[in-house]
Amino acid sequence: FDEWALHIRRNYIEDEDLLIDAEINGMSVEQYLREYVIPQRDETLGPTVRSGDITEIIVCDLLEFIFNYSVPRYKQKNRSGKNNSEHGTDVIGYKFFDKSKKPTEKDELIATEVKAVLTRSDYSPLEKAIAESKKDEQRLARTIDYCRKRLKELGNIEQSSEVARFLLKPDNNYKLTYAAAG
């Protein structure tokens, strides 16, 4: 359980940043996480945002560890507010066909719309995710560019460059798959 919780937490903040940020704010690590990083049950939007975050992280893990996509982890990190979700395509993953990562038409990008629910009585998240995934064609380019910039800000220059490859589909075609999860 501890390893899984640590994995989830690292989607929000890196170890070294957590220690520094907690110290600068005069807080324990646990207090800093509760007050500044992880959405909490007793806060407005906290349960909804946390449910969405966890569902997105699980989908990221599925794409990365089961289907072998590279999945940028940027959405939960350094938010302007812990209960503020990023807009756009929920999860993107990519694969390069060529080991040198030279663009080919066999490269793959998967754009996934994710929906979560907080109650047992609502069983329609997948239907909502499928409906929302149809909007992704219009917002995917903005999401890829935002992801590229966020990765660069987070110091992940290599992955930022890899993601940029998927910006200009007409110039560098690739296989694109839209998916939904809920």
Residue spans for each PLM region:
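A short acidic/basic microdomain associated with nuclease active sites
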Residues: I66-N84
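Amphipathic alpha-helical segments that form well-ordered structural scaffolds
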Residues: I57-I66
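Short loop/turn segments at secondary-structure transitions that flank enzyme active sites
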Residues: Y69, F97, V117-R120
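Charged, often glycine-rich, active-site loop that binds/positions anionic groups
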Residues: N83-K95
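Short, solvent-exposed loop/turn segments that connect beta-strands within catalytic domains
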Residues: D98-D107
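Interdomain/boundary linker segments immediately adjacent to catalytic/signaling cores
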Residues: F1-I57
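Acidic, metal/cofactor-coordinating or nucleic-acid-engaging core segments within structured domains
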Residues: R120-G182
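Conserved catalytic cores of phosphodiester-cleaving nucleases, focusing on short active-site segments
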Residues: V91-G93, I110-A116
